[in-house]
Amino acid sequence: MANPSCRLLSFGLVPYCQAWQYQRRWVRAKQRDRQREDGLMLLEHPPVYTLGTGSQTKYLKFDPAYPPAELWRTERGGEVTYHCPGQLVGYPILDLNHFQKDLHWYLRQLEEVLIITLEKLDLQGERIAGLTGVWLEGHKVAAIAIKVSGWVTCHGFALNICPDLEGFSHIVPCGIGDRPVGSLNQFLPGLTVEIVQPLVIQAFAEVFPVTWIATGEMPCWLSDDVA
């Protein structure tokens, strides 16, 4: 069986609400037409806090009526997290019928993408039993939270490469208060999103066998309101 086609889109800096809209359009398009290609969106966000469907406000260290940056509640799983420039965010839109219809398997595969990425930098990423994400010498460097509808995925992962970590001080990231957040740049100074992103793309294709569609152009069905 041929590998599924996967459109690769690299956006740069994108407001959270816009990227969320792209995801929802893509998921709807795939649910209407299962032949529509899978996708991977890679981007950065301006400073923003996001909550999952069941996120508890006790993990916020600020009044949600007066957040220090934008605050959104989304349909993903997980607790509060923070996005900002210097953090590479990946939103895979995958039909798990092409791979394995198992959410726990999918979460572990996303972790594997990031662990392989770190290996390419001679960094030893690791999992922690009972938790989701990737750690480096005890510091959480990657967060993962997903939404799956009709076996089509959205939301995804956030890899801290060279962000300003101060924004994390206003929350209990992912509801985990006893483990610090870190960035790759702390362990390998000089890293940038531009350096790491190609490694993430390589690692993604190693974990999820796909045939890339890398036109660099936004498809009309994704950008148009009619999508």
Swiss-Prot record:
A Gene Ontology biological process term: protein modification process
Compartments, record wording: Cytoplasm
UniProt keyword Transferase present: yes
Keyword Transferase: yes
Pfam families on file: LplA-B_cat
Pathway entry: Protein modification; protein lipoylation via endogenous pathway; protein N(6)-(lipoyl)lysine from octanoyl-[acyl-carrier-protein]: step 1/2
Catalytic reactions on record: octanoyl-[ACP] + L-lysyl-[protein] = N(6)-octanoyl-L-lysyl-[protein] + holo-[ACP] + H(+)
Domain of life of the source: Bacteria
Active-site residues per Swiss-Prot or TrEMBL entry: C174
A cellular-component GO term for this protein: cytoplasm
Keyword terms, alphabetized: Acyltransferase, Cytoplasm, Transferase
Domain BPL/LPL catalytic, chain residue ranges per copy: 34-212
Single GO molecular function: lipoyl(octanoyl) transferase activity
Chain positions recorded as substrate binding sites: R76, G77, G78, E79, V80, T81, Y82, H83, A143, I144, A145, G156, F157, A158
Misc. remarks from the entry: In the reaction, the free carboxyl group of octanoic acid is attached via an amide linkage to the epsilon-amino group of a specific lysine residue of lipoyl domains of lipoate-dependent enzymes.
Described function: Catalyzes the transfer of endogenously produced octanoic acid from octanoyl-acyl-carrier-protein onto the lipoyl domains of lipoate-dependent enzymes. Lipoyl-ACP can also act as a substrate although octanoyl-ACP is likely to be the physiological substrate.
PANTHER family: LIPOYLTRANSFERASE 2, MITOCHONDRIAL-RELATED (PTHR10993:SF7), OCTANOYLTRANSFERASE (PTHR10993)
Protein known as: Octanoyltransferase
